Amino acid sequence: MKFHCRAGRQVAGRSSRLSPLAALLLCAVLAGCATGPNANPKDPLEPFNRSMFEFNDALDHAVLKPVATAYKEVTPDLLRRGVGNFFNNIEDVWSFVNNVLQLKGEGAANSLMRVSVNTFFGLGGILDVASEMKIERHPEDFGQTLGRWGVGAGPYVVLPFFGPSTLRDTVALPVDKTVGDPVTKIEDIPVRNTLWTLRLVDNRAQVLKAGDLLEEIALDKYTFFRDSHLQRRRNAVFDGNPPEEEPEAEPEQ
C-alpha cells in the first residue's frame, strides 16, 4: 500500500497535465490506501469520503446556509417560486434528452410539453403552467441514463463542493454540467456566474427545514446522507421499482 501511495504522489506531481475530473478521481483512488478490511462494500473510500463530507459541511455552515437563510428571509415566496420554476424549466430540457436516450416515450413527451408550455405561456418558465395542466415532470440526468443501460453505480464518492455521488455519476457529471446545462453556454461571465449562484442558493434555501431537522435527529450525518443518497439514486434509475439487491458478503475478520 505504501508503494502505491508513493506512486500516486509522483503522479499527482504532474497534476498540471490532468483535467480537474481526472485529478479528482486520482484523489479518490489514492484514498483507497486508507481503507481497511472492514470497509463498507458500497463505500470503500470512506476515510476520504468522510473528510470531504466534513469539508463540505463546514463550508455549508460557514457560507452557503447563512446566505440561503438570508435569501429566504428577504425574498418573497412568490419570487422564490418563480426562480425555482425557471431553473426547473431549464432542467426539463436535459430531462427530455435523457428520456429519449433511455427510450422513455412518456417521459420524453411530457418533458417536451412542459418546456414548450412553460416557455411560451409561463413567461420563460417563471410560471409553472404545465403543472397546473397536470403535465408531470420526469427528471432524468446522464447518470441515470448510464444506469438505465446497465452501468453499475460503483463505489460511493463524496465530491468536494458537489457532495454525495457515485463513480458512475461522477463520470456523468461533466456531461450534465456542460452539455446538459444551458447556463454554461452563456458567454457573458457575470450573468453566467450570477445564475449559477442564484440556483445554488435557491436550491439550498428549499431544504433549510429538512437540514435543520436532520441536525437534530441524525446520530451519524455522514451515514444518513450516504445511505439515503444511494437509495434515492437507485430508485431514480429504476423509476421507483429497483430489483432486490443480493445479500452482501460478511467482511473478513
Name these PLM-found stretches:
Residues 89-167:
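Mid-length scaffold segments of soluble, non-membrane domains
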Residues 34-38:
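Bacterial signal peptide processing site
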Residues 2-22:
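Bacterial N-terminal signal peptides that target proteins for export
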Residues 84-86:
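Beta-rich strand-turn-strand
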Residues 29-32:
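C-terminal motif of bacterial Sec signal peptides marking the signal peptidase cleavage site
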Residues 144, 149-253:
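A structured, mid-to-C-terminal "fold-capping" secondary-structure block
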Residues 40-70, 88:
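Post-signal peptide N-terminal segment of mature Sec-exported envelope proteins
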